Amino acid sequence: MGRTLAEKVWDDHVVRRAEGEPDLLFIDLHLLHEVTSPQAFDGLRQAGRPVRRLDLTIATEDHNTPTLDIDKPIADPVSRAQLETLRKNCADFGVRLHPLGDVEQGVVHVVGPQLGLTQPGTTVVCGDSHTSTHGAFGALAFGIGTSQVEHVLATQTLPLARPKTMAITVEGELPDEVTAKDLILAIIARIGTGGGQGYILEYRGSAIEKLSMEARMTICNMSIEAGARAGMIAPDATTFDYLEGRDHAPRGEDWDAAVAYWKTLRSDDDAVFDAEVVIDAAELAPFVTWGTNPGQGAPLSANVPDPASYEDASERFAAEKALEYMGLTAGQALRDINVDTVFVGSCTNGRIEDLRNAAAVLDGRKVADGVRMLIVPGSVRVALQAVAEGLDKVFTEAGAEWRHAGCSMCLGMNPDQLAPGERSASTSNRNFEGRQGKGGRTHLVSPQVAAATAVLGHLASPADLSDTRTPAGVR
């Protein structure tokens, strides 16, 4: 019987298999940041162990870093301590680190791919749930806990139970206004935030194959929001073109050999998935969330749902609590929801294509009065590219704030936060209560919807703008 993509990569990395025990997998790339690594290094220090594979380990600073005045001391003592601890640990153990101010610094899941460290057929781990991002390359990538971080640092392996596999097939053409962010939000709304629990998701079909690499990263990034262990997309010419020439990509004969292997990383025709979901791309539309989890979303053209319409009691209760927290009324048009802040950035939508798409909507327009808009590139490299293309000027001339690279408003762990009751349209990945700051209210959107929302001051798509200019950009 044939094997799925996930099964092929998994099998290639098993270094020990015993009946009744989890498989022991070799890990090809271990990414670190300041939040989940301190206790792991402490464990190594107490046991007198070194980092086993320094060549497969890399760290960056992202979660707690400020996006303004980065040359000044960090005010928050906890954030400052975590960054100082990471720097000391990396120096003590010899781990490569890209700190705040370094040209390669940025959000960990942006840095790995742009350096060519993330490659098809590899295993990638990080103490961060959105490690699934790297699955866009056909890598098996997943977030791990701090004790597992220590285990990988010490052994370069990880004992894991083999997940099931789910195929999510998206066929057809995405409508002009529909982006990868809209697609993944629609998928999560369809299968639910627990629909992928225990599975590795494989996104496939003609609509997926037509996506750029950065759009594919957006899709895989949010796999965890459906409860999945990981998300993957089979590598193809788009993948190879993205990787070729990057800092850590193979070269010469090694490149040819790598591509030959990468081309085998597809699910066999006779592979059997444990579950399958099929989606018609033509039926999709710009999508936004209205509630307090990524599965509580709807097309922008819809109204806030009535909790009474849910047959399941737990879903009905969750909807009631979400509307109460979000300050919304059942039946209210989503387009009538005003926002205070718009955030473009994060490991979901902080790459150069995302900034290009937002800039294409903002070009020649102004952010609405009373709306604060933050544009935060996912890495210093992304920022430099945006400046080279003049995107920063488009943003600032529109009235948006152009910031330094970092996780920023994706999570309330740095100075970029919502105030209680403040409402945002955000290109990030989570809309939990307090995710962007205590009492903050978050609507997840695409970069294009974020930009249009900033201009009009309420949830909107580029089609809602008063002129007929068609925004350029890459889906």
From Swiss-Prot:
Family annotation (InterPro entries): 3-IsopropMal_deHydase_lsu, Acnase/IPM_dHydase_lsu_aba_1/3, Acoase/IPM_deHydtase_lsu_aba, Aconitase_4Fe-4S_BS, Aconitase_4Fe-4S_dom, IPM_dehydratase_rel_enz, IPMI_cat
Catalyzed reactions: (2R,3S)-3-isopropylmalate = (2S)-2-isopropylmalate
Cofactor(s) the protein requires to work: [4Fe-4S] cluster
Keywords of the record: 4Fe-4S, Amino-acid biosynthesis, Branched-chain amino acid biosynthesis, Iron, Iron-sulfur, Leucine biosynthesis, Lyase, Metal-binding
Domain of life of the organism encoding this protein: Bacteria
Range of residues in the leader sequence: none
Record carries keyword Lyase: yes
EC number: 4.2.1.33
Amino acids binding [4Fe-4S] cluster: C347, C407, C410
Enzyme class: lyase
Record's cofactor remark: Binds 1 [4Fe-4S] cluster per subunit.
Pathway: Amino-acid biosynthesis; L-leucine biosynthesis; L-leucine from 3-methyl-2-oxobutanoate: step 2/4
Location of the region described as Disordered in the Swiss-Prot/TrEMBL record: 418-442
Pfam families reported in the protein's UniProt record: Aconitase
GO biological process: L-leucine biosynthetic process
A GO MF label: 4 iron, 4 sulfur cluster binding
Function: Catalyzes the isomerization between 2-isopropylmalate and 3-isopropylmalate, via the formation of 2-isopropylmaleate.
Entry similarity comment: Belongs to the aconitase/IPM isomerase family. LeuC type 1 subfamily.
Quaternary organization: Heterodimer of LeuC and LeuD.
Name used for this protein in its record: 3-isopropylmalate dehydratase large subunit
UniProt organism field: Streptomyces griseus subsp. griseus (strain JCM 4626 / CBS 651.72 / NBRC 13350 / KCC S-0626 / ISP 5235)
